[in-house]
Each structure stands twice: as structure tokens, then as C-alpha cells.
Amino acid sequence: MNRRQILRGLVAAALFASLPAFAAIDVAGVKFDDTTTVAGQPLKLNGAGLRTKFVFKVYAAGLYLTEKKTSVAEVLAVPGPRRVAITMLRDVPSEDFGKAFTEGLNANTSKEERNKILPQIMKFGEIFAQTPTLKKGDQLTLDWTPNEGTQCYLNGKKIGEMMPDQAFYNAVLRIWLGDKPVDSSLKPALLGEK
């Protein structure tokens, strides 16, 4: 090896070392950082993908967990906080978003499960009743914090009341990860398979 090759190698190593420790995954122009923090705990991006309806791009979604998981059972059982981050890619009336939420919940939970979390489902519905339209670029975040509950944020601002039952958060996750997900290509993306 000559001096020039050694120098090039050192320069390349220095440039690589100066890159940020986090990288972003791009989904339809929406960047999802590799890490985020919920309730003071670092979370890792488990996966991110695109929700489409017919040919329309509706939103990009990312799932953050304390550790990467590749099965639905593991995701639902993982301890610690969790986050679902959604960025709208088009305007959607909240009535339509709420209807899709209800359909996804009904398709992936039993009647008994829904009855146990009915008060929280109603609270969640009230959140969308207060927001007439989710606009392109809006960021909806659903955080689960152990011993506290589920808190929703719209563009970084808390919306709605805390919903305390983990069964509710798991039911919401099954909208995307259940046996009948709202988008069959989004499920493997959130599980980090794509």
C-alpha cells in the first residue's frame, strides 16, 4: 500500500465516522428517524411503510419499539413504551379516518375484546370528532407508556384524554398488524420485513 491509498482510507474513515449515528428511512417523502424517545426511553424504528387505498397514498406510518420485533405476538408483548407515527400524505376527513379505524378494529378484535375497551374506543372517536380534517403533512402520533396509557398527539400537541388500558393500544396496533390488516403491504413493512 502506498501513502496515497492509506490517506484515502483515512479520509474515508473520517467521513464515515462524522455521519450522524441515526439514519432516516424515507417512505413516500416522509423521513422516519431510526430512533425516538417516549417517556424518557429510547425507541428503535421497527419498520415503516405506506398505507394506500386503491391507488392513492393515504399516509406513511412507522412503528417504534424498545427492541426490534418481527412477529405480531412479539410486538404486542414487548415491554416498555411504544409509538406509532403517522404522517398524512393527503387530506382525509376525520369521519373517513375514524370509519377506517373502526373497521380495522372490528376486523381484528373479537366482540368481547371490544366490549372491554369500549370506553376508550369512544374517547378515541371523540378525538376525531374534534378535528374535521386530517390534512396533508399532519403528524398523528399514538404513544403507549406503561402505567399511564395511550396518548395521542396531532402535530406535537396532545389531543384527547389518556386511555389507560394496554389492551386498547394492542387493539389499535392490530389494525395494521392483525390477521386482517387495513393494508396488507403495510403490515410486513411495520414488522421490518421490507
Where in this protein do the model-derived segments appear?
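Cysteine/selenocysteine-centered motifs that mediate thiol-based redox chemistry or coordinate metal-sulfur cofactors
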Residues: 184-194
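Flexible glycine-rich active-site/ligand-binding loops centered on an Asp-His dyad
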Residues: 159-186
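Short strand-turn-strand beta-turns centered on an Asx-Gly dipeptide
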Residues: 154-157
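N-terminal signal peptide c-region/cleavage motif recognized by signal peptidases
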Residues: 18-20
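N-terminal export leaders
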Residues: 3-7, 11
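A short, compositionally biased
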Residues: 29-32, 144-148
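N-terminal secretory signal peptides
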Residues: 24-78
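Mid-length scaffold segments of soluble, non-membrane domains
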Residues: 69-147
